[in-house]
Each structure stands twice: as structure tokens, then as C-alpha cells.
């Protein structure tokens, strides 16, 4: 499998797609809840699904419909999942107000970190020693895994839920987005840790709710998804100027993923469709249809 493209959502199914043809090649039933987020390990062996109160791992290389591991312990929807570099541990966030760090090989008692509000996303710093999370009260927290505590907190906008965070692959930048349509960007001048966040810009990306913010792997583009039925791509090198508005979904756009070369974007929407866009032409290259309810998460690995 050179290209792995997966989507999931409210119809309790996980769907694998042939990216070029648009054919659904495999469907996994996720019967007990919707799927909120998807994450593929960088070795392309495992798919993580974040559902209601649990995270499950599926073997990508077989047709086994059953999870190879299940991680129970959250008391609410799991809102994000992220793998450490060599996939030995993973971190999850939840509406129950906690972040949990799990040993992938033994789904036993995780390490816990607590927010005072539902946690919408957690990401791992490239140094693998810090976590950065955001919550519904509008707080960003930085957690030092060595010190086992929160070392920094900032609140860009009081009482405005921060829905999504994205960390640059080289540790140089952090981006966050909220329910008012605002994006915040910070530089991390020393790249090696998150101790010094230098504000770069704040801009209005959408007139309403932003559901996802994502930095491309080459740190040249920033994508935002919104309740306004669009996804937008912004140029980092050109002072976050709007590059492209992807217009075509009929309902909320919930999630997106860049291709490895940052030339394409995949989006997932409440209109049941997943779409592959050519960012240079704004055209829909492929539409993936098969979900019976909203598609709210997507994962792509084409490295």
C-alpha cells in the first residue's frame, strides 16, 4: 500500500479508499460509537481510531476487521490521538478533560494530565518530550513529560473554545484556531522545546467556527476547515495570505490532510463526502462517496 487514505464518521464505519480510483477497498464496522479522529502510524502498519471513551488500533496490512488493541479509560469522547516518533507510545485527549499517555504494546494504566475543561486536541512536540494541548475554555497548555507537569499556559482569547492545534514538523511553529474563526500563530525560536512562544500573527480565517487547523509538513502552508462549508489554505511564507478557498462541500468541513508534497488536500465533511483537491487549480480530483452520515475525520499517508 503506497498510499493509505482512510475516513470515518457518524455512520460507525471506517473506510479505506483507493486514492486514485475513488473505490472503497475495505470497510471496518465501528459499531459502538462514531469515530472522531484517525491517525496512521508513520510505518503504515497501524490505524488508530478515536471513538467514545476508547481508542482502537487496527492492522492496516491485513483484512482483519477486529482491533488488535483497545485502550479504555476515557470517560467521554476521545477528541484526538497522536503517535510518538517510533510508535512506542501514543497520546489521547478527551471531552472528559484529560490527556492520557499510553504504552502502545500494553494497554494498561496510562499516564494522566488534567485540564479544567474538555480537551479538544493534543499534539506531540518533535522533541518527543513535550505535549501541547488546547481546551474548550480557550487555554493552551504545554506539558513536560520529564517533569510530569504543565510548565506553561496561555489563553489567546478568554472563554472562546480552541478547537484545534497544529505543530510544525521541525518544531518552529505552533498554530491554533477557535470557534470565532480566529487563527493564532507562534514561533518557537529555539525549535528544541516549547518554552518560548513568540506571537507571530492573529488573523480571521473564517467568519464562523473553525473545526481544524493544520500545518503542512514542509511548513509552507496552513489549512483551516470550517462550519462555513469551506477549507482554506494560507501561505506561511507570504505573511499568511489566503492562497486558496476550496468551495464545494454542502455542509461543515471537519477535517483535512495534506499530501506529502503539500500539493493536494483531502477534506471530510458532514455532507457524507471525502474530497481530494488539487491546490494549484482548486479542482476536485476525486470524490469518495460511501458514508451514509457525516464524514468527520480523515487520515492520509502517501510517503
Swiss-Prot record:
It is found in: Cell membrane; Vacuole membrane. SUPFAM superfamilies: WD40 repeat-like. Transmembrane segments: none annotated. Gene3D superfamilies: YVTN repeat-like/Quinoprotein amine dehydrogenase. Its main location: membrane. WD repeats lie at residues 1-27, 30-68, 73-112, 114-153, 157-196, 205-244, 248-287. It is a peripheral membrane protein. One of its GO terms (biological process) is establishment or maintenance of actin cytoskeleton polarity. InterPro entries: G-protein_beta_WD-40_rep, MLST8, WD40/YVTN_repeat-like_dom_sf, WD40_repeat_CS, WD40_repeat_dom_sf, WD40_rpt. GO terms for cellular component: cytosol; endosome membrane; Golgi membrane; nuclear periphery; plasma membrane; TORC1 complex; TORC2 complex; vacuolar membrane. Keywords: Cell membrane, Membrane, Repeat, Vacuole, WD repeat. Pfam families: WD40. One of its GO terms (molecular function) is protein serine/threonine kinase activator activity. The target of rapamycin complex 1 (TORC1) is composed of at least KOG1, LST8, TCO89 and either TOR1 (TORC1-A) or TOR2 (TORC1-B). TORC1 binds to and is inhibited by FKBP-rapamycin. Interacts with PIB2; following activation of PIB2 by glutamine or cysteine and as part of the TORC1 complex. The target of rapamycin complex 2 (TORC2) is composed of at least AVO1, AVO2, BIT61, LST8, TOR2 and TSC11. TORC2 forms a homodimer. Contrary to TORC1, TORC2 does not bind to and is not sensitive to FKBP-rapamycin. LST8 binds to the C-terminal kinase domain in TOR2. Essential component of both TORC1 and TORC2. TORC1 regulates multiple cellular processes to control cell growth in response to environmental signals. Nutrient limitation and environmental stress signals cause inactivation of TORC1. Active TORC1 positively controls ribosome biogenesis via control of rRNA, ribosomal protein and tRNA gene expression, and rRNA processing. Belongs to the WD repeat LST8 family. Present with 589 molecules/cell in log phase SD medium. This is Target of rapamycin complex subunit LST8.
Amino acid at each position: 500500500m503506497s498510499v493509505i487514505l482512510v475516513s470515518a464518521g457518524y455512520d460507525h464505519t471506517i473506510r479505506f479508499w483507493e486514492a486514485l480510483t475513488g473505490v472503497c477497498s475495505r470497510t471496518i464496522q465501528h459499531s459502538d460509537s462514531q469515530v472522531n479522529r484517525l491517525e496512521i502510524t508513520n510505518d503504515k502498519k497501524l490505524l488508530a481510531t478515536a471513538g467514545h471513551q476508547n481508542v482502537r488500533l487496527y492492522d492496516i496490512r491485513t483484512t482483519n476487521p477486529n482491533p488488535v488493541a483497545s485502550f479504555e479509560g476515557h470517560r467521554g469522547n476521545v477528541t484526538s490521538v497522536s503517535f510518538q516518533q517510533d510508535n512506542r507510545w501514543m497520546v489521547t485527549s478527551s471531552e472528559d478533560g484529560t490527556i492520557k499517555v499510553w504504552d502502545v504494546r500494553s494497554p494498561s494504566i496510562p499516564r494522566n494530565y488534567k485540564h479544567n475543561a474538555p480537551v479538544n486536541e493534543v499534539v506531540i512536540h518533535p522533541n518527543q518530550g513535550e505535549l501541547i494541548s488546547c481546551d474548550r475554555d480557550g487555554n493552551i497548555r504545554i506539558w513536560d513529560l520529564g517533569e510530569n507537569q504543565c510548565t506553561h499556559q496561555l489563553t489567546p482569547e478568554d472563554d472562546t473554545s480552541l478547537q484545534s492545534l497544529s505543530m510544525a514538523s521541525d518544531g518552529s511553529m505552533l498554530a491554533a484556531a477557535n470557534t470565532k474563526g480566529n487563527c493564532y500563530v507562534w514561533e518557537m525560536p529555539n525549535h528544541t522545546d516549547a518554552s518560548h512562544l513568540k506571537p507571530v500573527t492573529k488573523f480571521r480565517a473564517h467568519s464562523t467556527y473553525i473545526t481544524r487547523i493544520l500545518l503542512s509538513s514542509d511548513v509552507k502552508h496552513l489549512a483551516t476547515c470550517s462550519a462555513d462549508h469551506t477549507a482554506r489554505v494560507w501561505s506561511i511564507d507570504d505573511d499568511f495570505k489566503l492562497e486558496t478557498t476550496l468551495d464545494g462541500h454542502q455542509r461543515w468541513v471537519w477535517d483535512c490532510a495534506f499530501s506529502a508534497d503539500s500539493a493536494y488536500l483531502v477534506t471530510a465533511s458532514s455532507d457524507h463526502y471525502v474530497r481530494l483537491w488539487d491546490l494549484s487549480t482548486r479542482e476536485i480530483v476525486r470524490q469518495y462517496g460511501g458514508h451514509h452520515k457525516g464524514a468527520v475525520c480523515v487520515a492520509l499517508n502517501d510517503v
